[in-house]
């Protein structure tokens, strides 16, 4: 009888101790945390890195549209006027180097964003391993992650930016002439890029040649004065990183003339977008886009007078086709 009582007490104690643990282990996680996505491109490897997502009111962000046009196009794609906008960066493994395209936001926009380092770690890499960072342009969702407070976040990386872009945003005279809403971009350059320059780690480039074997900057002006695309090519395969020349596949692919309130020169941005989309659709190469739903990799396909987005096919092996 005593043994039976002991057994029952032991079972009761075990239940009290272990049932919360079991319950915790079986509690579903309602948050999607993709973090990173691998893709092979010839001998190169591309790893999309998620900085997070943030709500964007596309009916306010997108301009040069007919009344109700943005809402209509969004509805056709089963999207509301406010969507969760991805912030993507890309790690390219090429010729023994680790090259990051854009650096995310760090703590600039709060806890929903700023996860590039976390995603990089999940993918198996550390900030100290990055050899180079290629910036598409000087907006905080692309350069914010260059600094952690007053420390350089990627201490061994050389940062590359077009000379046109750097000369414009690092010139106080240009800030003085800018409209009030654009002055924060100059402040961002001072906070995040000036320390890189002072440390001797900033390199500017002119367009017309490779930065690394198989990696070439391409002029993509309009969103900012010196906005850059980056083309990577290996064994006959190509991917073009478009930065912010395309911010909504649902709206700007069917109607490439629709622009963004953040465009420095909206007319030039629209012209650049039309040219880039036409080339990508005709040639059939991959594109990587900073704000299309993670991982932001896919193809552009012609569709009537516009285009449609064909996202990468999910692949556990990393081939993607």
Language-model regions: role of each:
Residues 19-117, 121-125, 129-143, 163-219, 236-243, ...:
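Metallo-beta-lactamase
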Residues 1-9:
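Bacterial N-terminal signal peptides that target proteins for export
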């Amino acid at each position: 009888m005593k043994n039976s009582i002991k057994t029952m007490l032991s079972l009761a104690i075990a239940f009290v101790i272990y049932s919360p643990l079991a319950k915790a282990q079986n509690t579903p996680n309602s948050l999607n945390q993709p973090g990173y996505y691998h893709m092979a491109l010839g001998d190169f490897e591309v790893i999309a890195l998620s900085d997070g997502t943030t709500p964007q009111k596309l009916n306010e962000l997108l301009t040069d549209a007919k009344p109700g046009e943005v809402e209509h196009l969004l509805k056709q794609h089963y999207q509301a006027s406010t969507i969760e906008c991805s912030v993507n960066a890309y790690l390219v493994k090429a010729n023994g180097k680790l090259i990051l395209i854009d650096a995310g936001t760090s703590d600039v926009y709060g806890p929903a964003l700023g996860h590039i380092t976390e995603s990089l770690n999940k993918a198996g890499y550390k900030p100290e391993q990055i050899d180079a960072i290629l910036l598409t342009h000087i907006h905080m969702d692309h350069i914010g992650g260059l600094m952690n407070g007053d420390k350089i976040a990627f201490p061994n990386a050389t940062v590359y930016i077009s000379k046109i872009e750097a000369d414009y945003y690092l010139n106080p005279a240009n800030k003085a002439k800018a409209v009030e809403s654009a002055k924060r971009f100059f402040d961002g350059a001072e906070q995040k890029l000036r320390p890189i320059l002072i440390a001797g780690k900033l390199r500017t480039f002119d367009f017309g040649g490779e930065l690394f074997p198989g990696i070439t900057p391409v002029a993509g002006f309009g969103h900012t004065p010196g906005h850059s695309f980056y083309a990577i090519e290996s064994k006959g395969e190509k991917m073009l990183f478009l930065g912010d020349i395309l911010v909504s596949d649902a709206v700007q692919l069917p109607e490439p003339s629709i622009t963004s309130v953040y465009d420095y020169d909206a007319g030039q941005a629209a012209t650049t977008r039309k040219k880039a989309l036409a080339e990508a659709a005709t040639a059939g190469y991959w594109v990587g886009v900073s704000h299309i739903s993670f991982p932001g990799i896919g193809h552009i396909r012609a569709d009537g007078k516009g285009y449609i987005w064909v996202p990468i096919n999910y692949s556990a092996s990393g081939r993607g086709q």
